[in-house]
Structures are given as C-alpha cells and as structure tokens.
Amino acid sequence: MRVPLLILLFLVLTSGCIAPSTPSFTQTPTCLEQEKDLNKAIKCYLEDPREIKALTNLSKSLKGPNEEWTIWNILKWEEENLKYDDNKPTNYILRPSEFLVKRKGVCTDYTVLTLGLLLTLNYSQVGFMIVHYAESTTLHSTAIANVSGTLFVLDQKLPPLDLGSYIVESGKAGKLITQGELYYVSKSNGSIIIEGPTILGANDFIRQDYKIDEQELKSIEIALKTMIAQRSKLSQVYELKYSLPRGFKERRAWILKIPRFRVIYNPIFKEQYLETIIYHILEDEEIKEHIKTATGFYLEVTTEQEDLIIKFYLAKQYIYKGHNKNRG
C-alpha cells in the first residue's frame, strides 16, 4: 500500500542586502523622507505618526494571546503576503506604509516593518541584528526578539530561530556567519531609542542553541495525540501502529515530514509548532474525508536524521450485524 507523504516546510531566508558602510547614526538624526541608513530609518520612520497609523490595524489583527503567538502570526503573515524583491532598483529603505502597499522589499525593509509591528504593540526586548558573512562583504539585517530569556531571529519567514539554529541553517545555505551586531530598540514617550551594538561572534551564536532530546520528542507525540482526540470523535487504538486490529477495517496511513525539525525547533514556541502540525493533519483534504467514517487513530513521532516524521493511522470499526431467525 502506498502511504501518502505530506511535507511541511519551514524556509529560512538569509539574503544579504546591505552594502558595508561607516556608521553615521546619532540618537537625534535629521530625518529624510527616505533613508538609506538602517538605524536612521528605524528611528525616523517609527517615530512618524503616519507610519504608526499605517501599522496600527495590521498589528492589532496579528496580536496573539502572548508574545510567542504574536511573533508567529507576524512571520506567518509576512511569509504569506510579502515577497523578497531581488530587483529592487534603489537602496533606500521603504517606509512601512510603502512596503505594505508594494508588498515586496529587501531585508532592511522587512526589518523595519517587523520592528514597527512589535513596537506598535508595545513589546519590549526587541531589536535588530546586522549579520556579517565570511564569503561576502554584503551584510544582512533581521529583526530579533528576546523571548523568555532566549534571543530569536525573526527573519522574514517562519519559524523564529534561536541563534544556534540560525547560524547552522545559514551555513547549510552556504552563508557562513562570522559575527552579528546586535541592537536593542525600545520606545519611550513616542521616541525610539536604539542601544548597541553588542558584537556576537560565531561561538556566541553556537552557545545559544537548543538541542531537542527524546523526552521532548515524546512530549510532542503525547500532546499531538491528546489534541487529535479532543478535536475529533476518534479513539486512540495502539494496535494500529502495527496492523489492523480485530474488529477494525480499512486501516490507512499517512506520513508528515518536517525537514530540519531537530535543528530549527525550540520549545518556547512548542504550542505554535503543535498547532501548525495539527492543522496540516486535520485539514488535509484526504485525511478529512477518511476521518468522517473512521473511529480509531494512532499517531507516532520519530526522527530520521534531522527530520521529524509523524505517522498517522486511521481505521474504521467493523460493526457486525447478526441475523434473527423467526421460529414458529
């Protein structure tokens, strides 16, 4: 029997977009309508009442019950609604209001927009990072956020990555990070305050890396089973893992593969990962159709190298209908 394979991809984008230059930023810059310097753009644009107004409705629509959900929602929205502009004709940084109209930009445009959304919602412990690479003088910028004591990179797409995951994924894409310039950004009485830089070497990135273990993988499996049982009429049937149990028929199986999960996962965003996985299982059209008549399920979580493998089984309970004989 052919087992359908569902693949849930999280893409990591680290395209460089900043030419090297000598910093000329002060806390009281002369603001222009368009800025090339990222520090000046963040301060000037995000102090502008016009930009705050442009961001307000979107930020409110993306606000979740906590910071983790808000960050997840922002990155998901950016991934689905914006695209990277490989042919941007100028190095002027887009104002958030412009970016929201054009729907395409480069890393600095994403950085300002993401920060603007977070600051409009009054989140603290947010900022940005300038990333240096070994093989190129072109730099990269990304928004960052400190969540529960861990620094996460918010780079245009899901998922948010801790520093260790970020440097590993960047290296896998052929871009070797040598250092990062870390800046924290806050807002006080309408004024943007930028603090930094703090210089992070490659070893600083690597030290801040979460390593998933078997206990956490088991907790993910248990949580997914519980969520499926609560959101459907299905009962958990352990025997479906191996065969079609007595009293059941039509055993079906699906495999959901999440590439690089062992590298990108961090338990601070566990709830968001779980909800995303459940959505891709329960909202798959083929699975939804079979759930209508199924009565039992089983789910198993394993790994293959760095990938997460979720095996999902469904079966229908056989109802025996006997025959009554009339005796005269």
From Swiss-Prot:
Tell me which UniProt keywords the record has, alphabetically. Membrane, Transmembrane, Transmembrane helix
Q: Which SUPFAM superfamilies match?
A: Cysteine proteinases (SSF54001)
Bilayer disposition of the protein? Single-pass membrane protein
InterPro entries to which the protein is assigned, alphabetical? Papain-like_cys_pep_sf, Transglutaminase-like_domain
Question: So where does this one cross the membrane?
Answer: 3-23
Q: Name one GO cellular component term.
A: membrane
Name where it's found.
Answer: Membrane
Superkingdom field = Archaea
Q: Does the keyword field hold Ion transport?
A: no
Q: Please report which protein family the annotation says this sequence is part of.
A: Belongs to the UPF0252 family.
Give the protein name, as stated in the record: UPF0252 protein PF0978
